[in-house]
């Protein structure tokens, strides 16, 4: 099932505390959004790329000239890191490492160093080596209920800062999925089968997205796996997050 994001009002006063009634209903297999539900985490601020302030461009984001049509040609290639079911946000980033939200590259590097550092000891292969802040694994493969637990938006942010571009899982916790879209850090993609049982950490994989879905190719095993369409969430992530998308579409004023 394709995901549909709500439409935005043309402008909202900064002092307004009312939720716009013009928001359309969002439906997915995991969550339902309506006019009283916000997709925008209150602590996230994405600066305009035209300002002199430090600009954070999420790793899943494409260039500003890309459009909805360009999403159909989005491809990710790299090594995969395989997990199983119920990977919670404490495993993705421990609470002690999520005290502040990164506002510059140095802080992104600091938070990236903690990506998936809360995994149990039986995970012998580390997502990031000690002392590093970039992972060699650009694609994460999981099972059911990926990103469950607390609502911290630091979870997708630290994965994107560490170099992850996409996650392929059977299902997602609704807040993690929403935060992934809102921040534009990683593509939360759904598999049609249990890919986490078919792939191993270190396999070389390619993800190709299209309007109707996507395809994950495991070059190590030679097998292909269909992915479900991410729908209207795709262009938002591709733009760099919900604020960047809204500015690009003229839904809210530019900071320039």
From Swiss-Prot:
Expressed in vascular bundles of roots, cotyledons and rosette leaves. Expressed in stem vascular bundles which branche off into lateral inflorescences. Expressed in connective tissues in anthers. In young seedlings, expressed in cotyledon epidermal cells and vasculare bundles. In hypocotyls, expressed in parenchyma cells surrounding the vasculature and further peripheral cells. In seedling roots, expressed in cells along the vasculature. In roots of adult plants, expressed in cells closely associated with the stele. Keywords: Amino-acid biosynthesis, Branched-chain amino acid biosynthesis, Chloroplast, Leucine biosynthesis, Lyase, Plastid, Transit peptide. It is an enzyme of class 4 (lyase). Its main location: plastid. Belongs to the LeuD family. Catalyzes the isomerization between 2-isopropylmalate and 3-isopropylmalate, via the formation of 2-isopropylmaleate. Functions redundantly with LEUD2 in the methionine chain elongation pathway of aliphatic glucosinolate formation. This is 3-isopropylmalate dehydratase small subunit 2. It comes from Arabidopsis thaliana.
């Amino acid at each position: 099932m394709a995901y549909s994001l709500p439409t935005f009002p043309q402008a909202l006063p900064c002092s307004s505390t009312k939720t716009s009634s013009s928001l359309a209903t969002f439906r997915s297999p995991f969550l339902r959004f309506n006019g009283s539900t916000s997709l925008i985490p209150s602590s996230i601020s994405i600066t305009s790329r035209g300002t002199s302030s430090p600009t954070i461009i999420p790793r899943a984001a494409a260039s500003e000239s890309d459009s909805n049509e360009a999403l159909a040609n989005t491809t990710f290639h790299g090594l995969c890191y395989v997990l199983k079911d119920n990977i919670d946000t404490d495993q993705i980033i421990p609470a002690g490492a999520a005290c502040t939200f990164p506002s510059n590259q140095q802080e992104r590097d600091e938070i990236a160093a903690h990506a998936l550092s809360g995994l149990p000891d039986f995970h012998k292969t580390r997502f990031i080596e000690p002392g590093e802040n970039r992972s060699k694994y650009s694609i994460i493969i999981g099972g059911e209920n990926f990103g469950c637990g607390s609502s911290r938006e630091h979870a997708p942010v630290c994965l994107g800062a560490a170099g992850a571009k996409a996650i392929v899982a059977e299902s997602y916790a609704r807040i993690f999925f929403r935060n992934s879209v809102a921040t534009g850090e990683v593509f939360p993609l759904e598999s049609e089968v249990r890919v986490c049982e078919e792939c191993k950490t270190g396999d070389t994989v390619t993800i190709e997205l299209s309007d109707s879905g996507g395809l994950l190719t495991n070059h190590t095993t030679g097998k292909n796996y269909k992915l479900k369409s991410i729908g209207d969430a795709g262009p938002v992530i591709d733009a760099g997050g919900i604020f960047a998308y809204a500015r690009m579409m003229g839904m809210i004023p530019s900071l320039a």
